[in-house]
Amino acid sequence: QTIVVDDITKPVPVMASLPTITRECAVTATDIPVPTATDNCVGVITATTTDALTYSEQGSYTINWMYNDGNGNLTTQQQTIIVDDIKKPVPVVASLPTITKECGVTATDVPVPTATDNCLGIITATTTDALVYTQQGTYTINWTYNDGNGNTTTQQQTIVVDDVTKPVPVVASLPTITRECAVSATDIPVPTATDNCVGVITA
């Protein structure tokens, strides 16, 4: 009498279709429940894979799971992993303050703003605009926060250079010049004043 034990039945995944796992910053092994299958001989089989279970770069990936009953029967399943950051950086200061100086604005007068990002944490703004302004007027700095994952936030900041301080005469009250016959230009010293921006001004 011949007795044959021949398992020809493949494992059957518990879940017919594995769910897509999506995260914004990264996917770690703890985010991926290891799937299982039922087998007519072994019972419950835990899947194995040679693919990575940690993904930190933005993109779409595929994990190839395998259920092996040890009797020559294999079943495979694929699972999609997506790392997709869709959140823009959030400026720490919702509205940047206007910076006003009388004579000029230098880079040290302009604190570089920051934003918080769900993946990177703190992001420092960048700009292609000037940070030094010496001429009277109103200017706009365009700041950009870039998280490196395709998400950017912009902010504008106003810079004002406006001299509102009048020159101050060096001599508060100019002396009367008296001559008996005539007064010439050499008898009249040209008065001066000090200015907060220019320095010494000749009248």
Predicted ranges, named:
Residues 1-203:
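Proline-threonine-serine-rich low-complexity tracts
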